[in-house]
């Protein structure tokens, strides 16, 4: 890859002290290295923040890692706070109880760098149980997954796999941020995005 643009990875952390290290480890160990990691703990009552901070503080190259905690404001407000701090050309959010394949960012950045017609790329996900045993695949290959998928989402014939997305940060200039008044913030955001932009798809699992 000729260019290595900065990628912002956001983690909205809440009550996942059991899973957060595995999540962060999958980001820190990405084969793609030009990453800005922003973790905001949304007032977790457990030890999520201290566990996450301890892990990141012990990383040798942590100058591009930001972690903070504050009183609970809800998922949407946390996602928006991260998005407004983002400096990357691309952005991806990983759930604090999810984790990624090591080549996720590298392959998706390459895809978007080669396909300027797409604002977002997504992939499949492997399903795992609490013991990390694989139980299936969240496979989008049989759905309308690429190009203009706005109407397909409305009619339930297509969609975006939220755990495996990467999109251009500049889309916020057109569609705005997540709507805190809604319960299903992802669906609303993807509808607004696909109303204005086309999306790409890689038929491969990149997340758990």
Name these PLM-found stretches.
Residues 26, 41-51, 95:
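A conserved acidic beta->alpha catalytic loop
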Residues 1-29:
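N-proximal low-complexity "stem/linker" segments adjacent to membrane-targeting elements
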Residues 84, 123, 142-208:
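Conserved nucleotide-sugar donor-binding catalytic segment
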Residues 103-136:
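Conserved donor NDP-sugar-binding/catalytic core segment of glycosyltransferases
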Residues 35-43, 66-70, 95-96:
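Short beta-strand/loop segment that forms part of the nucleotide-sugar
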Residues 69-86, 107:
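Glycine-rich, basic loop-to-helix element that forms the pyrophosphate-binding segment
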């Amino acid at each position: 890859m000729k260019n290595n643009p900065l990628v912002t990875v956001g983690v909205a952390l809440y009550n996942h002290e059991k899973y957060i290290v595995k999540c962060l480890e999958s980001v820190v160990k990405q084969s793609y290295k030009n990453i800005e990691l922003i973790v905001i703990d949304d007032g977790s009552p457990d030890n999520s923040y201290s566990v996450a901070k301890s892990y990141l503080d012990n990383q040798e190259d942590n100058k591009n890692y930001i972690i903070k905690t504050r009183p609970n404001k809800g998922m949407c407000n946390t996602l928006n706070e991260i998005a407004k701090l983002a400096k990357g050309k691309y952005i991806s959010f990983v759930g604090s109880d999810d984790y990624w394949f090591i080549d996720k960012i590298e392959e998706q950045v390459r895809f978007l760098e080669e396909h300027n017609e797409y604002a977002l790329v997504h992939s499949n996900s492997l399903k795992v149980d609490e013991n990390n045993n694989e139980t299936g695949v969240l496979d989008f290959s049989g759905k309308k997954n690429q190009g203009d998928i706005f109407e397909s989402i409305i009619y339930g014939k297509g969609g975006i796999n939220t755990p495996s997305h990467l999109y251009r940060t500049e889309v916020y200039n057109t569609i705005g941020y997540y709507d805190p008044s809604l319960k299903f913030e992802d669906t609303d955001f993807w509808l607004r995005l696909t109303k204005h932009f086309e999306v790409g798809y890689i038929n491969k699992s990149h997340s758990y």
